[in-house]
């Protein structure tokens, strides 16, 4: 895993988030859209606001391994970028005239699940949230006319796509060490957790989705499609590692450092 490339990326990108200039126009969305949208974004804002202390602790377990040197630093910067997302979303909620949350039931469930087992499971739960966030911010980007919401969702969509690639780089190396049964079990539980979570999120944010002209069932289906695309790419990376007995850092760029497929990420959100 080319952790140094990710360290460089996160160091640069987090600064861009904190200095992002937002439009100064007053929100003109009708209350029927503005009110549920503010509450919905506040939920995602809370989810991005964690300190990542337990994730960092898990990361320390693999950081000494040869192919994960620098991973601890990369995780620290990843968490810092998540917190920069929280600050951006807080500005968006304020723009919409909403209130920030200190607790919310789905967020509490995510946090508890994330630390039940080990680093791989923690990343799996985190991945579920990020795959759904990719669909969510893609929906806002294409469906919401407010310039602040549009700009923030555009930026966060691109960042989430990078986060997914970062996690894929890590997981492909870890899963390549599993036997066939371990891989099957990992895939099955990942798919089940993601499907359940997508159903819950679609229901929890149904008022916002409908205000934007999106059927919650369609949103859920897009989330499931996002999982399928991601899993296919992850398995492709694992196969590449299986076929290579020696992988030197200078022989190839990590999968996460290719240009993000932004067109693909937004295409399935189009009306």
Q: Where is each model-derived feature located?
A:
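Non-heme di-metal
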Residues: 1-271
